[in-house]
């Protein structure tokens, strides 16, 4: 299934993160902290400014990003995999 985000929305596939406790025990499931890094798999056209111009999204497909995983981030299933739909404002950095 294809997905096309609207406006300044970005679709991100979260990178899995193996977490270990201070004692070296591997944490899984709800005990493990979710990664806030992922790969951009789709981007919207951009945000419409007050003057009517469209400001393109600053990230592109394939970018690895660090994002804010809080209020406003929507989780969906796409072809059996979990993806995140978030606003460009929720992206904090691009990993280079």
Swiss-Prot record:
Q: Subcellular location, in the record's words?
A: Cytoplasm
Keywords of this entry: Chaperone, Cytoplasm
Q: Which family does it belong to?
A: Belongs to the GroES chaperonin family.
- GO terms assigned for molecular function: ATP binding; metal ion binding; protein folding chaperone; protein-folding chaperone binding; unfolded protein binding
Subunit and partners: Heptamer of 7 subunits arranged in a ring. Interacts with the chaperonin GroEL.
Among NCBIfam families, the record links this protein to: PRK00364.1-1 (NF001526), PRK00364.1-2 (NF001527), PRK00364.2-2 (NF001531)
Q: What does this protein do?
A: Together with the chaperonin GroEL, plays an essential role in assisting protein folding. The GroEL-GroES system forms a nano-cage that allows encapsulation of the non-native substrate proteins and provides a physical environment optimized to promote and accelerate protein folding. GroES binds to the apical surface of the GroEL ring, thereby capping the opening of the GroEL channel.
GO cellular component, alphabetical, reads: cytoplasm
Which SUPFAM superfamilies does the entry link to? GroES-like (SSF50129)
In terms of domain of life, where is this protein from?
Bacteria
Q: Which InterPro entries match?
A: Chaperonin_GroES (IPR020818), Chaperonin_GroES_sf (IPR037124), Chaprnonin_Cpn10_CS (IPR018369), GroES-like_sf (IPR011032)
Q: Name one Pfam family in it.
A: Cpn10
Which GO biological process entries does UniProt record here? chaperone cofactor-dependent protein refolding
This chain belongs to the protein called Co-chaperonin GroES
Q: What is its main location?
A: cytoplasm
């Amino acid at each position: 299934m294809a997905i096309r985000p609207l406006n300044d929305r970005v679709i991100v596939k979260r990178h899995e993160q193996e977490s270990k406790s201070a004692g070296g025990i591997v944490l899984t499931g709800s005990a493990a902290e979710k990664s806030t890094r992922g790969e951009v798999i789709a981007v919207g056209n951009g945000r419409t400014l007050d003057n009517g111009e469209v400001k393109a999204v600053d990230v592109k497909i394939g970018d690895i990003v660090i994002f804010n995983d809080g209020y406003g981030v929507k989780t969906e299933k796409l072809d059996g995999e979990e993806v995140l739909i978030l606003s460009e404002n929720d992206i904090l950095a691009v990993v280079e």
